[in-house]
A protein has these predicted regions:
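Detector for outer-membrane/organellar transmembrane beta-barrel domains
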Residues: 261, 273-413, 417
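Membrane-spanning beta-strands of outer-membrane beta-barrel proteins
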Residues: 101, 146, 203, 263-265, ...
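Outer membrane beta-barrel
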Residues: 43-78, 88-236, 262-275, 312-326, ...
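Cleavable N-terminal export/targeting peptides
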Residues: 1-36
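Surface-exposed loop/turn segments flanking beta-strands in extracellular/periplasmic regions
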Residues: 78-88, 186-192, 243-245, 342-347
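Outer-membrane beta-barrel "beta-signal"
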Residues: 415, 450-465
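Outer-membrane beta-barrel translocator domains and adjoining extracellular loop/strand segments
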Residues: 71-76, 135-144, 176-183, 232-256, ...
Length: 465
């Protein structure tokens, strides 16, 4: 009897061990440093909780970011590139310093193995703490608001056809290689600033996307994205006949979701890859702006949008990159740094032509350290007319407010170092960004011709396994 009991116990132990092995994914090699803010690429990484045919991964990082600026723009860990204060103001003569944990990030990812002749499914949620904050947030509790960044689902059919829906980076955002909706597959620089660098084309918007990948060398994608026509706050002078009507029809920074947009933005992009050595992509966005004024019986529509071309060359451990965009009415997609349109006294819509760029060199020093330098910026053409009263209106006219920027230019250097990494336990890293920034308005009046700032952002973070 004892012999049978011992045999039964051994058999049960063996079965339990087998089941445990089946429930635990094979260990993966410890990855090198990820010098960017983004934490999830299309290929799953890290340990997973296995539940039947699905794998669940909880990711993100916990960190603190120190910020120093030579002028006080009050932007927290996201810089207000378009409103750097001038030297003849109080804020232009005050530096600022703060520590913040708002960049800490939490993600939940689910990957489901495909059933026979069915799609491979994946879902992703990503949040941080850069949401709405109460006016006294920094006094005692520092209770920063939880914020949605990404939330999307994806279905891949035989590795060639992909359908994705949810909130994610716009298809106008520069990719690193193959067209993908996953955040780490975009070329968002090494910047610590949560607004990245001035001149970058990006946005996280609700969308439905279709991608066709006949090979790794060629991809094509089409995206239907949530629109939002915007003119900034106090940047565009509206015609006196209908300023109050028009203010409610364009996002001026305080409209929430009240703007009555006409139709979704349509974005398309193609990408060409030669292994990891060379990547080139090109695409564009079609937008339609709409408004109405008294007697409200003739809505006015105007098309706009823009084109962008991006390239990366990676010979070994160094990457040289260039991102260029141009178009009338493209301002929303360049971090909202330029208004989309101006409006003349006859009620016609005039898209503002905008040019932006990011060029840089990124170098992986070791598997634990990387460095990069970037030159970036945006230029907006002036677009104004004469009101019925005889005064100038629109954007960039002589005597326009100093918030109407002709150009914003930024030079940025970043160093990232992974102090330690332990398989299955995560890693500790330190990223530091130093930037010089200049904004030049179309009309400075009697004040200084431009506003300059130096910024240092340094972050220590623990990356969850």
């Amino acid at each position: 009897m004892d012999t049978f009991r011992v045999a039964g116990v051994l058999a049960a132990a063996a079965l339990t061990a087998r089941l445990g092995e089946a429930q635990t994914p094979a260990p993966q090699p410890t990855p090198g440093i990820n010098p960017t803010q983004e934490i999830a690429r299309e290929t799953p990484e890290g340990p997973a909780i296995v539940a039947g045919p699905t794998e669940i991964r909880i990711g993100g990082y916990v960190g603190v970011t120190g910020v120093f600026r030579s002028t006080a723009d009050g932007g927290g860990i996201g810089s207000n590139f378009a409103t750097i204060p001038f030297s003849d103001t109080a804020d232009g003569n005050l530096s600022e310093f703060r520590l913040s944990a708002q960049a800490s990030r939490l993600s939940i990812r689910v990957n489901a193995a495909p059933a026979p002749d069915r799609a491979t499914l994946a879902g992703y949620f990503e949040m941080d703490f850069n949401g709405t904050v109460p006016g006294n947030v920094g006094v005692t509790s520092n209770s920063a608001g939880f914020r949605l960044r990404n939330a999307f689902g994806e279905a891949q059919y035989r590795g060639r056809f992909i359908v994705a829906a949810g909130q994610a980076y716009t298809l106008m955002t520069p990719p690193k290689g193959q067209l993908s909706i996953w955040p780490s597959d975009y070329d968002l620089t090494y910047a610590v600033d949560v607004n990245y660098v001035a001149g970058m084309v990006w946005g996280r918007v609700p969308q439905v996307r279709f991608t066709y990948r006949p090979s790794t060398s060629f991809n094509w994608a089409l995206s239907v994205e949530n629109p939002e026509q915007q003119i900034g706050s106090g940047v565009v002078t509206l015609p006196s006949c209908c300023a109050s009507d028009l203010t409610g029809q364009y996002n001026t920074g305080s409209n929430g979701l009240d703007v009555a947009n006409f139709m979704p933005d349509i974005v398309s992009r193609v990408a060409f890859n030669q292994g990891k050595l060379l990547h080139i992509d090109a695409g564009g966005v079609l937008r339609v702006f709409r408004q109405t004024v008294k007697p409200y019986d003739q809505p006015v529509k105007q098309t706009g949008g823009g084109l962008s071309v991006n390239a990366r060359v990676t010979p070994g451990t160094t990457t040289v990159l260039g991102q260029f965009a141009y178009g009338p009415g493209l301002g929303r997609y360049i971090g909202g740094l330029v208004p989309d349109v101006s409006i003349s006294a006859d009620g016609q819509i005039h898209p503002i032509r905008t040019t932006s760029w990011v060029v840089g060199v990124e170098h992986r020093l070791t598997t634990q350290a990387s460095a990069a330098i970037y030159d970036s910026g945006v230029h907006a053409d002036r677009n104004y007319s004469v009101d019925t009263s005889g005064s100038d209106i629109g954007f960039g006219y002589p005597g326009a407010p100093t918030s109407a920027n002709k150009s914003i230019h930024q030079v940025t250097g970043v160093f990232a170092w992974q102090a330690w990494s332990i398989e299955g336990r995560g890693s500790l890293q330190w990223n530091t960004q130093v930037s010089w920034l200049r904004r030049t308005p179309w009309s400075a009046g009697t004040g200084p011709p431009s506003a300059d700032a130096v910024m240092v952002l340094s972050q220590i973070r623990y990356n969850l396994p």
